[in-house]
Amino acid sequence: MIEILDGMYETINYGDSLGIRLFHNDEYEDYPEHWHTGIEMIMPVENGYTVCAGKENYELRENDVIIINTGVLHSLKAPETGKRIILQFSASLLYSVKEMETLLALLPPIVYIPYDAKDEKLYEFVRSRMDRIVTEYDEK
């Protein structure tokens, strides 16, 4: 759900959530090419989802996770039915943590972590943190 789009620039409305926006998306709606200063994580929980960034199309399956870094031009294509979790957070949250600035500079534009990733520990780490954020966000 893009609320504020000026050309290709999306202003993320974090509301009162301290720089975090999460929504359970089940809309059959494609999102045009856009970019934002926040970092975005997407995980389909029912059916797939397509993320297009640059010349790459990422065909996400259920439980795959994709991380879209700040400033990356991307578009999203939804199937007719499905559900996905979309988490957007301000990069300033991470920049305030000691030594994260260097780490964020090394983060590639897109990080695609499939459910059946060879690096199971990475997937489990990212997924468990995402599940915890969703639980805490939904309880507030």
Label every model-predicted segment.
Residues 2-19, 73-139:
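A hydrophobic/aromatic-rich effector-binding and dimerization subdomain
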Residues 57-59, 68, 103-106:
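A short glycine/small-residue-enriched secondary-structure motif
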